[in-house]
Amino acid sequence: MNRFISISFLSLIALTFVTLGTAIACDGENSDEAAIPRIYDPGKKLTIEDLQAVGFKKSKTYDVEGLVGADNAYYGFWGPDPYDRKDYEVRFFPSHSDAIELGTAQADERSGEDAILDKDLMSWPEGVKDARECKGDKGSGPVSHGVQSCKSPKYWDYSIYANMILLCSGGDIETARILCNDLLETIEPKTSDN
């Protein structure tokens, strides 16, 4: 009888963990539903002041000569944690359709695993140093060789929101999309479900 009770008890514990794990996994699937689409027109026109109003810190203003159709472009950083802010490149266009039609090719060129980071090969080389991330051994000492490559892409993806293209860092596409969405949600707060 005691053996039956202990087996039943273990089965109950196992069932609890399976149920809990399933509930957590299903809840995680719904998080994508709340994300702002990668290309989205909320029907408004943005400026750098809209980003600064939510805590975006502008580091550099880029010369947009050669950046097809863009009104202006900036390099800066943002994050909900002031000690863990991430880098972004922001490009503003006259309209949402201009951002899509004129800005997509150069955003593709600047982001992702196949980003073009050689100044001589880029269609718009402005800010190329800011678009690179250094990886490798940068230390010194008996084991270190001090070899470091600064040819890795910093921006892994982008969002086109209103008249803005937002290039986002992150180390991989999934993280970059999360970082894009995090910033965009401060501009476009979630509406409550009714």
Spans of features found by a protein language model:
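Generic alpha-helical propensity signal that fires on short helical segments
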Residues: 19, 106-111, 117, 177, ...
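Sec-dependent bacterial lipoprotein signal peptides
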Residues: 1-24
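Second-shell loop/turn segments in exported
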Residues: 34-38, 86-92, 163-171
